[in-house]
């Protein structure tokens, strides 16, 4: 089967899941959760990332987003992964709040020299992203993706309503202020 060629124009959205190496449950401590929230806000404010929806689970991050500038999506995603890797590894090294799982996690994140061609000593995110192109001319599909990612904490039995989960944009869609700057996706603004 031929791989889908992604259209990186700025009109289109992408539904992306970034998974932590070995599915390590990193995002159970506030310091690591805050690193992702801060990075999402930084990239939304300064790097041209337009976020329609997000949801941070214990070992992965879901995003429905696009780039402000044409053809910049792959670079924004790459830079986001690099930046968050650096920030989270720095927090793991933080002596003020030591994590008892530090040694074990660092072993998981260590790059095997014979497998990767990259020079990074550690990898935090899996190299392969689950990334789906969501054409701007199919707003119903985009809205369905947003609803699906907001349901993740409910399916994981963390909350009974999506908007009760603070590490998600579901609360923004219910009129509450969330932790990350999101642009609400309004299906009425798009024509088929």
Model-predicted segments: where are they?
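Short catalytic/metal-binding and nucleic-acid-binding patches
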Residues: 1-192
């Amino acid at each position: 089967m031929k791989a889908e060629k992604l259209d990186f124009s700025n009109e289109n959205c992408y539904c992306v899941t970034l998974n932590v190496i070995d599915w390590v449950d990193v995002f159970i401590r506030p310091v690591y959760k805050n690193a992702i929230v801060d990075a999402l806000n930084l990239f939304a404010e300064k790097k041209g990332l337009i976020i329609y929806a997000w949801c941070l689970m214990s070992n992965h991050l879901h995003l429905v987003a696009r780039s402000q500038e044409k053809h910049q999506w792959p670079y924004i995603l790459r830079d986001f992964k690099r930046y968050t890797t650096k920030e989270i590894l720095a927090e793991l090294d933080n002596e003020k709040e030591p994590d008892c799982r530090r040694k074990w996690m660092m072993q998981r994140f260590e790059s095997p020299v014979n497998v990767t061609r990259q020079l990074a000593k550690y990898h935090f995110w899996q190299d392969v992203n689950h990334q789906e192109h969501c054409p701007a001319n199919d707003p119903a599909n985009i809205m369905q993706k947003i609803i699906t990612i907001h349901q993740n904490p409910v399916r994981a039995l963390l909350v009974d309503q999506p908007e009760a989960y603070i590490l998600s944009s579901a609360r923004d869609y219910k009129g509450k202020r969330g932790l990350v700057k999101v642009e609400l996706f309004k299906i009425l603004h798009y024509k088929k």
